[in-house]
């Protein structure tokens, strides 16, 4: 929508109702009506992926033993493609942040939607595995931003501030196993 109507629609929560659900017939109709634009943006994604792969290969050819070093973010944009395409995985009504401490007396709310650990388990960790694999694709090393998020995350109720938040625990052993598996797959 953004590419079609300029900045009128900043993310899927602001799209017309029939486009907010990926399986709605309106999405297929939009794809057909704007096939050239959809293909152009898919091509841009492909091109960026190709260039990242070439940069990794060049780094290795030039003697960098690891090549590119990537960064796996703690979360995703609440109006981005991840939350649109897998809405059941992300909890509405909460954000990820940090509890009150000496550096931030009221805590922090990063505005990042948390993944529901129960939904992650129900999906056999495929969303996490796929995201890790995609992030490892062109990197020789991958830094996990806030690695503690594999163990627990501070969830902040929307509109109530971080002080009203609490820790939600995640299945650390299972998530670490996925990381080990994907690390082995990617060398």
Where are these regions (language model features)?
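Conserved, well-ordered alpha-helix/loop/beta-strand core segments that scaffold catalytic motifs
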Residues: 41-73
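Alpha-amylase-like alpha-glycosidases and glucanotransferases acting on alpha-linked glucans and related
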Residues: 1-49, 75-187
């Amino acid at each position: 929508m953004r590419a079609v109507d300029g900045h009128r629609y900043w993310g899927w929560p602001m799209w017309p109702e029939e486009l907010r659900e990926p399986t709605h017939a309106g999405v297929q109709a939009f794809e057909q009506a704007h096939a050239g634009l959809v293909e152009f943006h898919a091509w841009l994604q492909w091109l960026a992926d190709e260039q990242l792969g070439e940069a990794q290969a060049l780094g290795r050819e030039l003697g960098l033993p690891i090549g590119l070093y990537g960064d796996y973010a703690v979360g995703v944009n609440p109006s981005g493609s991840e939350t649109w395409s897998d809405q059941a995985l992300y909890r509405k009504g909460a954000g990820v942040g940090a509890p009150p401490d000496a550096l931030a007396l009221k805590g922090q709310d990063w505005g990042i939607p948390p993944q529901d650990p129960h939904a992650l388990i129900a999906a056999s960790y495929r969303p996490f595995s796929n995201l890790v694999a995609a992030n490892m694709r062109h990197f020789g090393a991958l830094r996990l931003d806030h690695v503690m998020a594999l163990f627990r995350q501070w969830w902040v109720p929307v509109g109530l501030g971080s002080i009203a938040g609490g820790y939600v625990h995640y299945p650390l052993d299972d998530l670490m196993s996925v990381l080990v598996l994907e690390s082995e797959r990617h060398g």
